[in-house]
Amino acid sequence: MSITSLKNQKEFELINKLGKKLHERYFILVIATKLPKIFLESKYNTFLGIKVSRKLSKKAVVRNKIKRRIRHLIRIIVSDSSFKAIKFAMIIIPRKGFEEINFSHLNYELSKVILRNM
């Protein structure tokens, strides 16, 4: 399973427009399964965008740690065999408290939301 990141503002706006917005306690997830031609022609199956606001933390070190955790969570979730044939894109926006919650709980919450909306 190959994952790539959303590269520019146009891609983020496209997913925001086409995707379904899901508000959870620790994050907001925008997920789009019906992708435009730009994404369908790509060799990648999963497109990931991460938005970490300065409101979450003023320190870049903390924001980067949050991004690393999200990337790792997505790698774990997408490595599941049920995602092999599906092309989808998502944007994850962490909320306050995301950095304090333990990894296994985040994994459970995120996988539950993604699987429910595929």
Swiss-Prot record:
Give me the reactions it catalyses: Endonucleolytic cleavage of RNA, removing 5'-extranucleotides from tRNA precursor
Q: What are the UniProt keywords, alphabetically?
A: Endonuclease, Hydrolase, Nuclease, RNA-binding, tRNA processing
User: Which residues lie in coiled coils?
Assistant: none
Output one GO MF annotation.
ribonuclease P activity
The enzyme's E.C. designation: 3.1.26.5
- State the function annotated in the UniProt record: RNaseP catalyzes the removal of the 5'-leader sequence from pre-tRNA to produce the mature 5'-terminus. It can also cleave other RNA substrates such as 4.5S RNA. The protein component plays an auxiliary but essential role in vivo by binding to the 5'-leader sequence and broadening the substrate specificity of the ribozyme.
Task: Extract the HAMAP family matched here.
Answer: RNase_P (MF_00227)
What is the name of this protein?
A: Ribonuclease P protein component
Instruction: Please tell me the species this chain comes from.
Output: Rickettsia peacockii (strain Rustic)
